[in-house]
Structures are given as C-alpha cells and as structure tokens.
Amino acid sequence: MNLVATLVLAALSLTPAHARPPVPNTPAPVTSTVSNVYDGDTFTLATGDRVRLRLVNTPELKPAEAYGIEAREATKAFLSGKPVQLAYGATQRDGYGRLLAAVKVGSDLLAVHLLERGLGHLFVIPPDETDMTPYLEAQERARAGKRGIWSTPEFQGSLHITSFHANADGDDRSNVNGEYLRVCNISSGPVQLAGFRIADISGASWDFPELIVPPGHTIKVHSGQGVHQLDPTEQLAIYLGSSDPIWNNKDDRATIYDRYGKVVDTRTHSVQKEGR
C-alpha cells in the first residue's frame, strides 16, 4: 500500500461514524427558486443550498406523522415555480449546513401560511429576535378551528415531544447525555415547568426543575448530569441527573405529566418505528 493510500485510510478511521457534513462557507442567498421540497419545513434551492424553514416545525414524513404529507404538499404549492425571498437571523446555518431562513413569496410568509392551516407549530431556534405576534396569532386561529395537527390527540397539551433520542451514539453508559428528548411549548403563553415530571415505560420518573419556557421554544431534556441552561436567548437544556442511561434502546415510552398528574404528552421509541 502506498503512502497516500495509507494516509487516506488513517484519516477515515478517525472520522466519527455519525459525523455531520461540513458546513458550507458560501454566501447565503437572499433570493432564489426552489428545486425540491423534502417535507413541510425542508427544501432545496436552485443554488443547491438546503433550507430549514425558521419559526415552524411541521410533521415528519419518516416516521410518518399525521398531516406530514399535507404539510409537504402545502409547501410545494406555495413555493413551486416562484421566486422566493430568504431572511436570516443571528445564525444563518445549522449544524447540518442547512440555511435557517424565513421564506417569503411576495409579501406572504411560508411559516405563517403553514401555521394558519394547522400544518405545523411555532418552533423557535434561539437566538431569534423576530416579532412572534403574527406567528402566534396564526397558530391560535388554527388551534381554535381545530385545523390540521390541532385536531389530533398529540397536540392537546401545552408541551409536545418533537424528538426522542433514546439511543445515544456509541456506548450509552459512557454517553448518558447523548440520550435526550426535545420538548416544545406549543401553547400560546409561557409554561412554568416546576411540578412537571417525565416518566419511562416502567413508571420511574424524574422531576423537571423550575424553568419558564416561552411559547415556541424547546427544551433539550438530557438523561445525565450537567448544569441547566435556563436562559431563553439560548437553547434551553435541563439534565435529569442520572449516572446511568434511562431509556431502553429497543422499546420505551416517555410521558410528561403536569403538576396535577395529568398527561401532557407521550412519545414512544421503537427500533421498528424509528428505523434503528
């Protein structure tokens, strides 16, 4: 084996199995057209840049969630064949290299269009100083009319579990905080988490700390130990304080209870459902 091949193989062996793609350093476009729509909040521009729409989270296609197809089709109809304008916040790209952009066609915002139809909920990636009023108003009109996601059981509480990472990268025992859930405040106002708790499928539970979550903001709920991040100008994060993994890698269920013991939301993790 020659020296070049040896060096290439050595470099590959040091690359983490779950490494994210490199973040492009090209300028972020402010106008473009759309070449492909993946789902309701993710699409590709004619420039080749992939966009993650700001201020809305739409249902997933994989695993299939209610109104995921409708959200994708609404985004296609809104964007296809039209020039789009893109506006950025403090962070232009996420860790996957996707542009984080508010998207307009003419004077109409795609995020508001989706929220109005109940095809997504407000989803804030801090820091973001956008005036949330039109987004919240659109969401509340959809909720009042029980349109889209607001007609389903999963969206009747104040909080919604948007993702459940029960299987951490590598050995869970040495990466306890690699287990986490992302929980979003889908209500119209701030939620105080004091008195809330989260339980696994066996009934074991962990209390949430005192924390006010603004509407649309998310909390990363880590299994392990760490210092809570309670400043809403950054990503909120709490630590359940376990020294061992909490969630079963094959099948488990996370259930959030409010201070009165009422179920706020629940989400299952299954190898079959999650595809891993």
Q: Where are the regions a protein language model picked out?
A:
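Bacterial N-terminal signal peptides
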Residues: 2-13
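Small beta-barrel nucleic-acid-binding modules, primarily SNase/OB-fold domains
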Residues: 14-276
